């Protein structure tokens, strides 16, 4: 491009110089013709062109201006030539630089491609190493998980046995306490009935004694009235009509024996009142003591029932957790087996206790603790030890069958037991009050509360007290 521009500049400069030369020649021819014409005119004016001085001066000026322009154009031509040479040099340098840059770019590209190829090879080696490490880690994790699963199953069986023994002990203890409470309640009810009967007997006895005393007093009053009338007759006094015993007032003087008997009756009434108050106080204290004991027994029974419920909930939560862990392990094993089957039965280590039959061409190590055979292999975990010999939980077993020479193994078929994945509650011993075999019997109802009225229910009169009544009477 620089060469073509320089050539066009040189061509333009040559054209301008040729045009200026043509103009100069034309001007000179015109000036010569003018001179010749002048000469001819001077000679004979035969037919030449007459140029006026003004026109001649104008042409002279024009010629001078054209010469000046020609000089300017020559100077510009020289400058353009210099520029063209500089551009040609610059173009040459740019070509050299482009060649150098292209060679350097090729070298850098080759270096980058070599570096990337080395990195790709290193990544491939690292990938192979990671694959080997992953297989080793997977095999280690599988063996570790199988070992932990077996350990969990053993711990589960031990926990089931321990929990069952503890639950049986708690149930027996609770049943003993319930029977003891029932016996105490029955004995207290019998004691209460006996006290009630004794109270009624004491009330009847007291009423009979009071009636006997009143009758005896009336008889003595009648006797005294008769003696009074006899004395009045002896003293020849007019006998007044005998007053009614109910009209006798305290103002009438009584004999000394009547006063003594009245004092005795008052003392007897005071003594019986004291005995009645003491019996009522003793009865209230015993009833409060019985109520307090019954409240303590109810609280103890409720606390034991709550403790039993917490133990049962903890056992059920533990069973659920164990069953969930086993089911998750089964699902992982089944998914892994399906992936292995889809990939062409590549031999891998499998987690115990699910047996797996590898292909005959397998050369990888097999996880220890697994038994392989060509016939049907089934794993059944140890059943939980129960009191009645029943298995409350059966873990699922996977069976692998031999299908001939075409395939070494088939897809395992998970088979779950029909028994629920929970522990059943142990059957407590039958209670005398209830027939429900699952739940413990409810606490016995409280004895009927008797209104605390002033009575002599708890005081049992001694033979000396009963014998004191006839002996103390005059």
UniProtKB/Swiss-Prot annotation:
It is found in: Cytoplasm; Cytoplasm, Cytoskeleton. The keyword Coiled coil applies. Residues 53-237, 253-332 form a coiled coil. Residues 426-451 have a biased composition (Pro residues). Residues 1-10 have a biased composition (Acidic residues). The modification Phosphothreonine is found at residue 349. Residues 31-47 have a biased composition (Gly residues). The record marks 101-102 as: Breakpoint for translocation to form RET-CCDC6 oncogene. GO terms for molecular function: identical protein binding; SH3 domain binding; structural constituent of cytoskeleton. This is Coiled-coil domain-containing protein 6. It comes from Homo sapiens. The lineage of its organism: Eukaryota, Metazoa, Chordata, Craniata, Vertebrata. The gene is CCDC6.
């Amino acid at each position: 491009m620089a060469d073509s521009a320089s050539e066009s500049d040189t061509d333009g400069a040559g054209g301008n110089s040729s045009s200026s030369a043509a103009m100069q020649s034309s001007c000179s021819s015109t000036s010569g013709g003018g001179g010749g014409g002048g000469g001819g005119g001077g000679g004979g004016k035969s037919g030449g062109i007459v140029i006026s001085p003004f026109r001649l001066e104008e042409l002279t000026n024009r010629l001078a201006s054209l010469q000046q322009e020609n000089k300017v154009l020559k100077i510009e031509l020289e400058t353009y030539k210099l520029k063209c040479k500089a551009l040609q040099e610059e173009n040459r340098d740019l070509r050299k630089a482009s060649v150098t840059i292209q060679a350097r770019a090729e070298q850098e590209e080759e270096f980058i491609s070599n570096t990337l190829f080395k990195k790709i090879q290193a990544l491939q080696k690292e990938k192979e190493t990671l694959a080997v490490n992953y297989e080793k880690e997977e095999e280690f994790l599988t063996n570790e998980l199988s070992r932990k699963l077996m350990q969990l199953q053993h711990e589960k069986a031990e926990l089931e046995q321990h929990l069952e023994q503890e639950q049986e002990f708690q149930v027996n203890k609770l049943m003993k306490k319930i029977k003891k409470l029932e016996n105490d309640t029955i004995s207290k009810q019998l004691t209460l009935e006996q006290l009630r009967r004794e109270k009624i007997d004491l009330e009847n006895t007291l009423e009979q004694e009071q009636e006997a005393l009143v009758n005896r007093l009336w008889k003595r009053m009648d006797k005294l009235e008769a003696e009074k009338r006899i004395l009045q007759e002896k003293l020849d006094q007019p006998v007044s009509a005998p007053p009614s015993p109910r009209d006798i007032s305290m103002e009438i003087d009584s004999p000394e024996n009547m006063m003594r008997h009245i004092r005795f009756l008052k003392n007897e009434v005071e003594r019986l009142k004291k005995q009645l108050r003491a019996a009522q106080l003793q009865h209230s204290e015993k009833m409060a003591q019985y109520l307090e004991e019954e409240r303590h027994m109810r609280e103890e029974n409720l606390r034991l029932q709550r403790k039993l419920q917490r133990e049962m909930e903890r056992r059920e939560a533990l069973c659920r957790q164990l069953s969930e862990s086993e089911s998750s392990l089964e699902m992982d094993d089944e998914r892994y087996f399906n992936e292995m089957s889809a990939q062409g039965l590549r031999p891998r280590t499998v987690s115990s206790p699910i047996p797996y039959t590898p292909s005959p061409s397998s050369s990888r190590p097999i996880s220890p603790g697994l038994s392989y055979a060509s016939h049907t292999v089934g794993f059944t975990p140890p059943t939980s030890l129960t009191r009645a010999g029943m298995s409350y939980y059966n873990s699922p077993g996977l069976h692998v069958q031999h299908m001939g020479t075409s395939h070494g193994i088939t897809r395992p078929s998970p088979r779950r037991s029909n028994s629920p994945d929970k522990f059943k509650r142990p059957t407590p011993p039958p209670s005398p009050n209830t027939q429900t075999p699952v739940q413990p019997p409810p606490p016995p109802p409280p004895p009927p509360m008797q209104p605390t009225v002033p009575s002599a229910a708890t005081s049992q009169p001694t033979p000396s007290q009963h014998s004191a009544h006839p002996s103390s009477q005059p």
